[in-house]
Design a protein with these regions (language model features):
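A contiguous catalytic/ligand-binding core that recognizes phosphate-bearing ligands
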Residues: 33-98
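Short, His- and charge-rich active-site/binding loops that engage polyanionic ligands
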Residues: 1-52, 77-78
Length: 98
């Protein structure tokens, strides 16, 4: 999070909760957004302009499916084991009380 001219490191929960959800379980948590459409999607538009972040990680999984439909996870990481960083967006979500 931006603090004045600096930055702030925080631990956050994975999964984007759109601000129109009445509860955290009102629908699926969104876990990815396409860079080509993020600014136009209602769930991400404001966050893509105002709440960007960097997400450090050691790697990530991609899944492949064979002809029988069996899925295989592939862990993608750097050869030198240095950290990777993803661009992300974040959202503060507060349950609306009626």
């Amino acid at each position: 999070k931006r603090q004045g001219l600096g930055r702030k490191l925080e631990s956050l929960r994975w999964g984007f909760v759109p601000n129109w959800y009445r509860t955290v379980n009102a629908g699926p948590l969104l876990i990815n957004a396409r860079s080509e459409t993020i600014a136009q999607k209602p769930a991400f538009a404001n966050a893509s302009r105002e709440r960007r972040c960097l997400i450090p990680c050691s790697g990530f999984y991609e899944w492949s499916k064979d002809l029988e439909g069996n899925k295989t996870p592939w862990f993608i990481k750097r050869n030198d084991d240095a950290p990777l960083v993803f661009g992300g967006v974040w959202q503060e979500w507060v349950m609306k009380v009626r």
